[in-house]
């Protein structure tokens, strides 16, 4: 299955659970992409209770594709949080996936 998870919130627990699901799907050999959008691009800074940074790194190590909206990153002056992308890529991911989840 091709799964797309869009994280559009910087709420650490939401992002943490999204990456937990993405990791589970990757473990089951699904083709998984996570796209950070809106304030979701800020979630990788979290190293607190939910430590989104670590769980996102685990996702990448499993071969998951992690992308962030370049406009969202630039407007927050975050630098390189992960590979930068755009809405054209998000559109393609949505069009090609079997399931899309927005959190």
Locate each region found by the language model.
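Short, well-ordered alpha-helix to beta-strand connector turns
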Residues: 29, 63, 97-98
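Histidine-anchored nucleotide/phosphate-binding helix
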Residues: 14-28
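A glycine-rich helix N-cap at a beta->alpha junction
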Residues: 49-75
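C-terminal structural segments of small proteins and small subunits
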Residues: 74-103
């Amino acid at each position: 299955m091709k799964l797309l998870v869009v994280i559009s919130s910087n709420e650490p627990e939401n992002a943490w659970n999204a990456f937990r699901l993405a990791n589970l799907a990757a473990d089951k050999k699904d083709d998984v992409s996570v796209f950070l959008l809106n304030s979701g691009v800020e979630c990788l800074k979290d190293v607190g209770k939910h430590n989104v940074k670590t769980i996102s790194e685990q996702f990448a190590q499993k071969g998951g594709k992690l992308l962030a909206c370049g406009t969202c990153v630039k407007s927050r002056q975050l630098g390189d949080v992960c590979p930068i992308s755009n809405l054209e890529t998000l559109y393609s991911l949505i069009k090609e996936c079997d399931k899309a989840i927005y959190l």
